[in-house]
Amino acid sequence: MVTHRQFPNHKVFEMEIGGRPFTVETGKVAELANAECICRYGDTVVLTTCTANPIPKAGIDYFPLTIEFEERMYSVGRIPGSFNRREGKPSERGILNSRIIDRPMRPLFDEELRNDTVVTCTVMANDYDNPVEIVASLGASIAIASSDVPWNGPVATTNVCHLNGRYIVNPSTEEREASDCFVCISSTFEKVVMIETEANEAPEAVVLESIRIAHETNMEIVKFINGIVAEIGKPKFTFEKAAVNHDLLDDLMNYGLNQIEYALDTDDKNVREERLTAARLDFQEKFGEKYEDFDTHIEVCLYKMQKKVVKKWLLQGKRVDGRGMDEIRPLAAEVGVLPRVHGSGLFTRGQTQVLSICTLNTLSAAQKLDTIYSEETKRYIHHYNFPAYSTGEARAARSTSRREIGHGALAEKALLPVIPSVEEFPYAIRVVSEVLSSNGSTSQGSICGSTLALMDAGVPIRRPVAGISCGLISDQETGEWRTFTDIQGVEDFHGEMDFKVAGTTEGITAIQMDLKNKGLTMEIIADALERCRKARLEILSEIMLPCIAEPRAEVSEFAPKMLSMKIPVDKIREVIGSGGKTIQKICADTGAKVDIDDDGSVFISAVDSAAAYAAKKMVDDICFVPEVGKIYCGKVVRILPIGAFVEIAPGHDGMVHISKLENRRVEKVEDVLNLGDMTYVKFMGFDEKGRANFSRKDALKEMENNK
C-alpha cells in the first residue's frame, strides 16, 4: 500500500523587490536541518539550509561559523568541464559570494557563541539576470533567523546600480555591466552592515545615494523576513557563554593596565610585540600561582585590556603610533625594482609593504572560466599572496585562503575600470601582489603597488589608482564615534570597521567595508568616504605620481610585442587557408603567433616588433581589396601581346590592356613596359569573370592633373 506524503508545514511567502516577485518556500525539503528555505527570484532558485551543533566546540576562542556557497552546473544547463564531469572546489566568484553572505551576518552573532554553525546555499537554477548572491544572502538570513540558532538579525542584501542618471534596484547583468556605479549593500532595519562597490570612477555623492536607496529597499525586505520568522520561527536555544575569569581580569586591569598602555604606545610593531611579551611574563610571575587557570584565560584577558586602551585613546583622538586622526603613515614608492619582469612596483606604507609584479602575454593566456556565471574569460587578473613571514609568523605555506582570494579580487576590480580595452592594448595582463610586511591595510597597498607595476610595464591605464582604509571606534552608551585614516594592524584588530576605498583623482573604483559592530549610519558612511577621498588624493599627488607620472611609452623588451587588426569576416577562410596552411606559413615565415576570432579580430604576437609587423603585412596582403578609381604602384610580372599584368600586392595582379598603356597608340607592349618594371596604374574594376582591370594612361593623366 502506498501512502501520499503530506507537508503540513509547507508555506509560501512572497514580496516584490525591484519590480519582480521574490518567493520563499519553507517546510517542504531538508526537514532534518535546523531551518531551510527555497528562495526564487525570477528564474534564479537557491536552496539554503542552516545547521548547528547543540554542543559547544571546546578549545577555541572564536565563533565557528561556516558559509558554504555551492555552485551547481545543472543550474545553467551545463555539464562541468572537469575530467570526472563533477563540480570540484568553489570557483573564485563562488568564494567571493560566500564572503558577501558571511561578512554582514558574523557581527550579529554573539561573539561568545561556540557552537559549530553551517549555512549552505545551493544554487539550483540561475537565469543570469537575477543575481544568485542576492537570492542566497536573503535565503541565508531567512534560514538563520527562523532557526533555533541565537542571532541578532535579520539582515537584507540588495544590489543597486547607477545607469544613465537612474538608480536601478537589483539590475540585470547587462545593466550592471553598462552602469558607472554598482553597489551590493547588506543592512539591518536600522544600519548598514556590509558594503561592496565596483564603479567607473564614480563621485562620492553617487555612491552614497546608491547606498541609501539599497538600505531603504533592505528595510522593506527586513520587515518581510520578520513576518516570516513570526510565523515559522523556532525558539532560540540557550548557550553557555565562553568562560572568562573575571577575578583574574580585574586583578590584571588594576595591576598591569599601565604596562599595556606602554606596550601599545609605539609605531613599531616589533617593539609592541616585545613589550606585550614582557608584560605577559610579568603577569604570569605575579598571578600564575594564584590562578590555576591562568594559562587558559590570559590571552582573552590581554585582548580585553588592549581593546580597552585602544578604544579609550581613539575616542580621545590619540592613536597608538602618535599620528593624527587623518594622518597617513610614512609612504614610499618605487618602480622597476626587478630585472627581466615586464613591470614591478614596490609600495610601502609604514610597516606595510607590498611588491607587485606585472606580466603581459597573448590574449590566448586569458583565464578561461567554467562556472555558472555569464563571464567566460578574464583578461585582467590580479593575485594576492599573504605569506606567514609578512607578519613574523613561523608557519608553513598552505593553499590560497579565502582572504587572499577576497583581497586579490578587491584589487582586481579597483584597477579594472582603468585597464585599456583589447583594441587599445591587445594583451592578457596578470598582476601578482606579494605582501612582504603586514601591519594593516595590505589590500590597499596591493592596489597602489599594482598601479605602479602596470605603469612600469607600459600598460596605458586611464589614470593611476590608489587605495586607503578608514577605521571607526564608538561608544555604544554615549553614541560618540570617531573615524580615522589609514588603520594599522592593532587598530584593525581592536577597532570596529575596516572601510577600504580605492579610486583615482576623478572618483571611486571600488569599496569593501567590514564591520565588527552592529552597523553604520549614513552619517558615518559619508564621513568615511570623504576621509578616504582626501587621503587618496594625497597618496596619488605626493608619492605615486612623483614616482612614475605616466605609463612607459613602450612595453618591456622582455614582453611579447602585440598588434591587433580587423579583417572582413569573409576573409577569415583565406587567411587561415586550407587545413591552416596559410596561417601556418605566416607564423613559420615571421616567427609570430597569429590568433583570429570569429568576428574578424586578429591578434598578432611576436618577440620583436619587426616580426609582428611582418606578419601583419602578410595578413593585410591576403585581405587586400583594391578600390575602384584608386592609383597603385605595381610591378610588371607578365607580358602578353595584348597587354601587361601588374601586381599591386602579393597575390593581387591585373591586366593593363595595350590600349590603356599610353595616351597614344602603342604597337608593342615592350615599347612601354618590360618585365620587372615598376609603374603606376589605376584600378578600373573587375570584369564579369572577377579579373582586375588596370589603366596606366588614366593613372598618368590623373597624376599630371594633380601636379
Which sequence ranges carry the predicted segments?
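Single-stranded RNA-binding regions, centering on S1/OB-family and related RNA-binding modules
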Residues: F558-P560, V569-K707
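Conserved phosphate/anionic-ligand binding catalytic regions in large, soluble enzymes, centered on
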Residues: A35-C37, N130-V149, V335-C358, N439-V459, ...
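Long, basic N-terminal domains or extensions that often function
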Residues: V2-E240
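Mobile "lid/hinge" segments at catalytic clefts and subdomain interfaces of large enzymes
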Residues: D148-L264, L454-A553
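Long, charged amphipathic helices and adjacent flexible linkers at domain junctions
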Residues: P235-H246, E538-M565, Y613-C633
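Flexible, glycine/charged-enriched surface loops at secondary-structure junctions
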Residues: E111-T117, N152-P154, I221-F239, N270-V271, ...
